[in-house]
UniProtKB/Swiss-Prot annotation:
The gene is Vax1. It comes from Mus musculus (Mouse). Residues 100-159 bind DNA. One of its GO terms (molecular function) is DNA-binding transcription repressor activity, RNA polymerase II-specific. This is Ventral anterior homeobox 1. PANTHER family: HOMEOBOX PROTEIN EMX-RELATED (PTHR24339), VENTRAL ANTERIOR HOMEOBOX 1 (PTHR24339:SF32). It is found in: Nucleus. Pfam families: Homeodomain (PF00046). Residues 239-252 have a biased composition (Low complexity).
Amino acid sequence: MFGKPDKMDVRCHSDTEAARVSKNAHKESREIKGAEGSLPAAFLKEPQGAFSGSGASEDCNKSKSNSSADPDYCRRILVRDAKGSIREIILPKGLDLDRPKRTRTSFTAEQLYRLEMEFQRCQYVVGRERTELARQLNLSETQVKVWFQNRRTKQKKDQGKDSELRSVVSETAATCSVLRLLEQGRLLSPPGLPALLPPCATGALGSALRGPSLPALGAGAAAGSAAAAAAAAAATAPGPAGAASQHQPAVGGAPGPGPAGPGGLHAGAPTASHGLFSLPVPSLLGSVASRLSSAPLTMAGSLAGNLQELSARYLSSSAFEPYSRTNNKEGAEKKALD
């Protein structure tokens, strides 16, 4: 009896051992399959950046993890990297890497002329128009569509270049005009003094305004002050002689009867003197000489600056001459009363 249980125990042990072995073998086969399925996933992590356009590689990876055999639409290729190691990547069979490159479409002159005419008419040709145009030119609709896309891109680039060129040309023209104006302003001489002078510019006034110099300015200042004092004295002198001498220089400038003051004034003034701005020339000469003597011009200044300053002083003295005459009269009256 004890032998039978021993045989049964051996059988049970053998059955359990066989079950264990089969279970271990099944587990090992599963681990091997899992390792085979996870191996391409590790390899696909790096090259997916280079082949990001093939979205079917993810499907291949999923199907590979589920089954040990590759699906029909996936294939394996071996790639050697820069370090020399060989890597296995899975790519979809639809991605034909061995196919030749697409040849560029060559249009005839007639086709280009017709396409250009249609583009000038309308930049977007779609629908029946594109179908009819492709049929007439013996082209495909895709070729016509791509040609119009390229033509629109070229036009945009040309317009951008033209706008940049126009801006550069306008800036250059503006700069040149500004430089030309500055050059003209630098070379422009001050306004001519002979145009401002009366016909009697050959007298003492013209010589004083044309050729300024320090000794001449000093002499003119002395003569002007003496003439102004004499004119004031003649204006304040009582009697018909004073009245005649007061109005006589403004009319003709000829010497008339009166005291020595007016006679000396007419002797020092030119015989043919004309009025400027309805004012007597001797009084104008005196005011100009006094203003020039109050602020003498230096010889170190440029000739253009001196002429411009002289013209400005000449105009200012002419404008304010009546006020200076009244001031001289008031001063002379005060001196006479004292």
